[in-house]
Amino acid sequence: MIYLEEVHTDNQKQLVQFIIEEYHSYVPSAVSVGRRIDWLIFDDSVVNQFNIPQPIGMIGIGSSVYPPPKDLLTRVGLSKDEYKNVFNEFANNWRFCMKPHTIKNAGTQILKQVRQHCKSAWYEKYGDDLKHLLTFVGGDNNGAVYKADNWEMVGETSGLPDHKSSSMKWNNKEELKELFVKPTGENKKLIFYKGL
């Protein structure tokens, strides 16, 4: 049986970081900005020699994105200012990473459990009602696990310049002026949405 364990301890956080850095296919970084709740994923049939359950992956939600993609605003029927006012009702599934050769078709079971836990975990930790989940899928993936769990593909990002494969949000203002090139469509990510 697959189950989730919310991450609280430093040891759990190190496991999350290890899983992401070793197994995430296109963004092997455990760095995030803002709010964040992670879960380790277990299958009770996967244990070590001492019969201790071993994580088979991780999944996390965190602060939504700003500025919001136009396709997301269109889907939820909000202006940019309205979105800003309800920003904390949105969470981004910022990372979902499984070790290779784990349980086949586990993704929908995991996403269902996240939906069952996320609202109460978000409220308990941050005091806000979580109403919307979104995620971005890149790296030539098609979001099959989200589609199988009935998430709606609402559009795609505008992409990044060809010389960048990940966000430039970590660059300072001067670096951005030097690096910025109007996106030409490369490195686009699909945007998936799930109302809660």
Label the predicted regions:
Residues 187-196:
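Flexible, glycine-/basic-rich loop-and-beta segments that form/coincide
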Residues 1-35, 40-42:
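Short amphipathic alpha-helix that is part of the acyltransferase structural core
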Residues 29, 46-50, 119-127:
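Alpha-helix termini
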